[in-house]
C-alpha cells in the first residue's frame, strides 16, 4: 500500500513537471521579482546546455519566443531555453540590474536541470542584442558564446574573463533602426558601423582579420 502511494506520488510529480516544460514563471533577483518563460524538452539529458534569448525594446518574452523559436532545435538537440522579460520591456544595457538577472537564471537552471555551466549561450535581438554585448563585457566567464542580432555595444569594453570569446553577429544591411553602417548623428551620441565592431572583437579574439 505504501509503495503504491509512493509510486502514485512520483507519477503525479512527473506529470506536473511535464506540464511545466513550457512555463511562464517568476524568480527572485535580490528583492525584485522577475519573469521569464522556460522551455525544457522531454528526454532532457543530464548536464544539458542552456540558451537564453532576449527580446528587443518594447517587446516581451512571448514575442521573442514566437520569433526565435528555439524550441524547434531544443526538441532534437535537447537543451533548455529561457526567454526572460525585461523591466518595462527594456534592458539595463549599462548597469548591473540585468547582469544579476542573467546570473540568477543560470543558477536557477543549474539547480533545476543541472545544466552544463560550460555550455551556457546568450543571444538577443535589437536592444536584446545590446544586452548581449553588455553581458559579453561583464560575464564572459559565465557564458560560453554570444549571438547578438541587430544590436550594438553601447559601451565597448573587452570581456571580463580575459579569454577569446566566440561570437556570431547577425545584422541586416537594410536595418532602419540600428543602421548597419552606423549613425554618427544618433541622439545618444552616435555609433560606428557593424563591421567595425565585429573587427574589434575579431582582433581581441586573435582571429585572422582576412575572412576565409
Task: Give the location of each predicted region.
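Active-site-adjacent alpha-helix of alpha/beta-hydrolase-fold enzymes
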Residues: 173-212
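A domain-start/cap signature at the N-terminus of enzymes
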Residues: 19-50, 62, 73-76, 80, ...
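Conserved alpha/beta-hydrolase
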Residues: 78-88
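Alpha/beta-hydrolase active-site loop
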Residues: 94-114
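Serine-hydrolase catalytic-loop signature spanning alpha/beta hydrolases and amidase-signature enzymes
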Residues: 58-60
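Structural cue for short, hydrophobic secondary-structure segments
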Residues: 53-56, 83
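Bacterial Sec-dependent N-terminal signal peptides
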Residues: 1-24
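Short beta-strand/loop motif that positions the catalytic acidic residue
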Residues: 169-171
